[in-house]
Design a protein with these regions (language model features):
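Alpha-helical transmembrane segments of integral membrane proteins
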Residues: 14-18
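Extracytoplasmic/lumenal domain signature
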Residues: 63, 67-85, 90, 97-136, ...
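Hydrophobic membrane-insertion alpha-helices, especially the h-region
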Residues: 19-31
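Terminal targeting segments of Actinobacterial cell-envelope proteins
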Residues: 1-13
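Residue-level detector of alpha-helical hydrophobic segments embedded in or interacting with membranes
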Residues: 8-11, 35, 52, 58, ...
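N-terminal low-complexity, Pro/Thr-rich disordered segments
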Residues: 39-79
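Juxtamembrane cytosolic interface motif at the C-terminal end of transmembrane helices
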Residues: 30-38
């Protein structure tokens, strides 16, 4: 089994679906002046008004599919955060299409490694016994926060069981690490509205809301994957990076459930950030139809949820892609409706990506080798406005790589007329987004689980030989020439963050690297 798979705890048996929802209590504390220089002041509208209420029916235990609402104005592939510069979540925004900003270094060198000595490692026990884990994992992408006077903070998960907070220019810690009880597997999310809050999960069952305006990171609230739903399935990790939409947090767990949490962010009379979280909706990532066709109960949600026009999209390890209209919940109600269902036939851990026209791009693995996977391929473009026949095009990725599996772990990247995808076999493939036609492919040292990062006509791709590659994609239909490559000495399975002429990325060797242009 793959390293990612070995991180799982023992699987749980199948269980019936239970859909739970609760009514929220509206209250938001007044904002006060910001205290820490590293962060900019929060925006005046940091606590956004929820969207207007719409009338939608309650979900059923085995929800049916109906037509989604007509999309509104297309979202922009800009960052979720507007009060400050940075990358606050995996792929930067609600549609998972913001990659950072350039310029990209053209003569790169490693200017720091964290830790300077040793590695970010710890032991963890699963069904195969106790073993050592190192690095920042296949889901890891650093948050990068630009504060006052150009200060940059890099926040990253690590397999030493901690979340780390580093000076982006030097790699020195800027605040104490937050230690958890097991692997800190997933990408976390920094509050995009300027509140000094950090939302992060761990393999110790807990998803945490953390205050960053104290002398050290302080857990204000946590959510237990084992006890927060009546019937958790499969596992208790938190791999995905949550989204903050208004005063609500959206997150999927490896316990196979999706959550909407009202945060009630505010400040106390001392000016310290406060939250009063309440789970207002839980939705199963599975249904009876899916469980009936699977040989196992592996239906965990390992991707970072995407959101557009009041609808949240996510997939699971059983290959079920769902869209839930949660606009009523985000307006203070308690009802949601499933408006989209599609089965890929295979484990789908890459995040769903949404383009400006509302199309979905979904990448799946190839491990079960089902007839459905042969039918729809491993890379799909879907139109949720046609829920009964959403498949626009599909592309097969049958080439096998690590552990005898094919398909895709990395999240695809949209850029201009192209979609870029990195495969378990080690291929980096460029396809036309409109037609799904392959235009070129380049073979790298697989498996390539690091997600592609296109910025300013430069495509960054890490490989498992430990090399970061930069390709010139200014002429998208041709095979891109390599601009440079840089060895980091160990498999790059995490996704890099790029901002202000720097790159930050972690490796399986246990280090986090700051990369910048050579001087002189």
């Amino acid at each position: 089994m793959s390293q990612r798979r070995r991180a799982r705890h023992a699987a749980r048996p199948r269980i019936p679906i239970v859909l739970a929802a609760a009514i929220f209590v509206a209250a938001v504390g007044a904002l006060v002046a910001w205290r820490l220089e590293l962060w900019p002041a929060p925006s005046q509208d940091a606590v956004a008004a929820p969207p207007p209420s719409v009338t939608i029916p309650s979900p059923t235990a085995a929800p049916t599919t109906s037509a989604p609402p007509t999309p509104t104005a297309a979202p922009s592939p800009e960052p979720a955060n507007t009060a400050f510069d940075g990358i606050t979540t995996f792929r930067g925004n609600q549609t998972r299409t913001y990659y950072g900003s350039g310029p990209v270094p053209m003569h790169p060198r490693v200017i720091w490694r964290y830790p300077a000595q040793g590695s970010l490692c710890s032991t963890s026990t699963d069904q195969h016994g106790e073993r050592e884990w190192c690095g920042t994992g296949w889901t890891g992408q650093p948050n990068v926060i630009v504060g006052r006077r150009g200060k940059i903070e890099v926040r990253t998960n690590a397999y030493d069981g901690a979340y780390h907070f580093l000076n982006g220019k030097t790699g020195e810690p800027v605040r104490p690490a937050l230690q958890t009880g097991d692997l800190a597997k997933g990408s976390a999310t920094s509050d995009p509205d300027g509140f000094p809050l950090y939302y992060a999960g761990s393999r110790d069952n807990l998803f945490r809301v953390i205050a960053l305006d104290r002398p050290e990171p302080t857990v204000l609230w946590d959510l237990n994957a084992e006890t927060s739903v009546p019937n958790p399935v499969w596992n208790d990790d938190w791999d995905g990076a949550p989204l903050v939409v208004g005063d609500y947090l959206l997150e999927g767990g490896e316990n196979s459930w999706f959550y909407v949490i009202r945060l009630h962010r505010g400040y106390d009379d001392r000016g310290m950030v406060t939250v009063r979280p309440k789970v207002v909706l839980t939705v199963p990532g599975f249904d009876d139809e899916l469980l009936a066709v699977l040989p196992d109960s592996n239906v965990s949600i390992e991707n970072s949820v995407a959101f557009r026009d009041g609808i949240v999209y996510f997939a699971n390890s059983g290959g079920l892609v769902q869209g839930w209209d949660i606009s009523r919940v985000l307006s203070g109600g308690s009802r949601a409706e499933r408006v989209f269902r599609f089965w890929t036939g295979e484990d789908t851990d890459a995040s769903v990506v949404i383009d400006q026209s509302g199309f979905l791009y979904v990448a799946s693995e190839l491990e079960r080798f089902t007839a459905r996977a042969r039918e729809v391929g491993q890379l799909m473009k879907l139109d949720p406005r046609h829920p009964n026949d959403p498949l626009v095009w599909s592309f097969a990725i049958p080439e096998l790589g690590a552990e005898g599996a094919g398909g895709v772990w990395a999240t695809p990247a949209l850029y201009g007329r192209m979609i870029y995808v990195a495969t378990n076999h080690g291929d980096l493939i460029g396809l036309e987004r409109r037609t799904g036609e392959e235009r070129w492919r380049i073979h790298l040292a697989g498996p390539t689980w690091s997600s592609p990062v296109p910025i300013d006509d430069v495509l960054l791709q890490g490989d498992c030989g430990g090399t970061m590659h930069a390709f010139d994609i200014s002429e998208p239909l041709r095979e891109p020439p390599e601009l440079w490559s840089l060895s980091l000495g160990s498999c790059i399975e995490s996704t890099p963050s790029v901002l202000e002429d720097m790159i930050w990325v972690g490796t399986r060797g246990g280090g986090v690297y700051g990369i910048a242009d050579r001087k002189g």
